[in-house]
Amino acid sequence: MAIFVNEVSRTFGEYLLIPGLTTRQCTPQNVSLTTPLVRFARSQEPRISLNIPFVSAIMQSVSNDTLAIELARNGGLSFIYGSQPIAEQAEMVRRVKKFKAGFVSSDSNIRPDATLRDVLALRARMGHSTIGVTEDGSPNGRLLGIVTSRDYRIGTTPEDALVKDFMTPFSKLKVGRLGISLKEANNIIWEHKLNTLPIIDENDNLVYLVFRKDYDAHKDNPVELSNKATKELLVGAGINTRDYAERVPALIEAGADVLCIDSSDGYSEWQYDTLRWIREKYGDKVLVGAGNVVDEEGFRYLAEAGADFIKVGIGGGSICITREQKGIGRGQATAIIDVAQARDKYFEETGIYVPICSDGGLVHDYHMTLAIAMGADFLMMGRYFARFDESPTRKLKIGNNIVKEYWGEGSNRAQNWQRYDSGGSEALKFEEGVDSYVPYAGKLKDNLAQTLGKMKATMCSCGAITLPELQQKAKITLVSSTSIVEGGAHDVILKDRG
């Protein structure tokens, strides 16, 4: 006979936090948002911790290399989407790793026998005024010089003038050698009043550029998520349960720091087999998350299979219609509460802490703090990040509104790839996601600062300055529909903000 769970399945919108004692120590500047990303044993430290509890969703319309770089610079982590050819996904991972937190791989390069006309065309296309002149015009060719806007005058320098005749030649350049630290590179820039410092290898091949303008940008990102030894930004990548034997090695070779199996329903033998294959081939060297699940059984199944973190949530995403199409899922708040208890129980029994990620169901910023208070270690978000300049989709004007495209991995547009199947050979015949728009919001950094500011303020109101302390001290109450209305502006005529 079927098992009936009589507990009501609830969402974040049905709860509020009750204030706790705010001590003098509880100020936003004292709040730490550090949280574990992957499993660790009692009394040990996790191999990777996030500096903010946010990761971006494994989606075509969200997580490419551009967003991954910006999110890592602000303390979070992106999982590059896997619904693309293996080589293209691996190349996105490489581009993030090459960024190296202040060291920029040059994507505007030219040959010495090109003309000023070519320089102007390249500048118009790429938007960069600093162009590396290499022997073969490639990003990592032998460096012969640099061209900037100070090397020519439009209207005076002939457009057919050869680059080699007006560039700043290698002999007059200040350069840094590969292996130099960012601090050392910045010291050279400031000492010699440079705007750009090329970094070259032992054969004089161009490897990176370091820009003066990035010095302040780097200072503005004190929570940057990077490898302390190499200074490379951290990045994740999504995998599936079909081509993992080919995809995983390519992503590891490209430098991915952590992987995640991407599926709407992770409680399956297909995920178990994928996890076991990775463990048998790589041992514990490769970090990999799994999911999604919504109860203790699903959590324990994946934890025992070797998952380094587990995603929680089925059907709660803004573009996900799995519940509508298949009738499976669970209210996100109830799922998090249940799985968090399962995680803590597993930790007591085994001494192994397996972090959980809340994926979906976050409508308002305060829902993020609620999800953490209920037990989530970190949050995966798609719609939130899709709104920003750095997401890979087009910015459009529809009527009087500026929007960005946003579609689910279960939509026809994402071609379903290998995500929403059951692991067999039969192709999926229906959608589990929609194609939509989200309001354009501007730059990631600006919006993230506001969101994190709200989270820190809420934590202080609860008397907590760390995420574990919030989970210990939080008092959470169910609210009625009328009290939700009471919590907003009511019984007044609002002024037009336009």
Feature annotation, model-predicted:
Residues 43-47, 72, 97, 120-124, ...:
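Surface-exposed amphipathic alpha-helices with a cationic face
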Residues 66-69, 244-254, 288, 293-312, ...:
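Catalytic cores of alpha/beta
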Residues 27-50, 57-59, 88-128, 133-136, ...:
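Bateman/CBS regulatory modules and CBS-like beta-alpha motifs in cytosolic regions of diverse proteins
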Residues 73-88, 256-268, 308-326, 362-396:
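Glycine-rich phosphate-binding active-site loops on the catalytic face of alpha/beta enzymes
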Residues 84-94, 140, 155-160, 181-183, ...:
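Active-site-adjacent beta->alpha loops and helix N-cap segments on the catalytic face
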Residues 1-21, 108-111, 176-177, 183-187, ...:
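Alpha/beta catalytic cores of nucleotide-metabolism and tRNA/nucleoside-modifying enzymes
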Residues 79-84, 109-110, 130-134, 175-177, ...:
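Catalytic beta/alpha-barrel core
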Residues 47-56, 102-107, 170, 228-238, ...:
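Short beta-strand/loop segments at the ligand-binding rim of alpha/beta enzyme cores
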